[in-house]
Amino acid sequence: MNIRSIITAALALLVSTACLGGVKQQKVMNNNGKALVVFFSHAGDNYSVGNIKVGNTKIVADYITELAGADQFEIVTHKYDGMAYQPLCDLAKEEQRKGELPPYEGSVDVSKYDTVFIGGPVWWGTYPQVMFTFFSKVDLNGKTVIPFTTHEGSGLGLCVRDVRKAYPKANVTGQFSIYGHDVRDGKARVEKWLKTLDY
């Protein structure tokens, strides 16, 4: 290797490091193991999009399931069925204040999955309490956990923090958020995000 090649390689390394801003970048690698998408989604009366038959988060979860070739488990509770938006907000706030853990239907065996996408709407700054019920029952420590959210201005809120608190030994990374009113035209955005994770 001549001196010009060495200098060129050194400059390339310097530029790539500068672009990272000195922050260690953590990339989620698809190891061809099966992934699981776990989510809670609320249909019915929703902020910004009105009364919808399919919840915003379910639409995103379906995109991920299709594009990543993943399996899917929906956290289903009927506690919020038929509720208008404002009463639901009030109930969600009260559940959060009390630390309630509403029950949900069914169960899932996560032992065969290395990667779990976990998503929901952002209610009062974090995931709905029924998702914390899932966190309390299902151990995802040792796995790669990828949070995603739908929202109307909260972004990821405290969801990533709360997933890390629930699973301190998981690799919580690769998070994604999207406005609820954008999800119906958001498949390309989800696909672009998944490509950054090698899916």
What positions do the PLM features span?
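Short, glycine-/small-residue-rich phosphate/pyrophosphate-handling segment
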Residues: 146-182
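N-terminal beta1-alpha1-beta2 submodule of the flavodoxin-like/Rossmannoid cofactor-binding fold
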Residues: 19-115, 125, 132, 189-199
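A charged, well-structured terminal subsegment
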Residues: 171-199
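Bacterial N-terminal signal peptides that target proteins for export
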Residues: 1-7
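Bacterial N-terminal signal peptides
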Residues: 8-17
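Solvent-exposed loop/turn segments at secondary-structure junctions
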Residues: 42-45, 77-81, 122-126, 151-156, ...
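Short, conserved loop/helix-junction motifs that constitute active-site signature segments
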Residues: 111, 136-142, 166-167
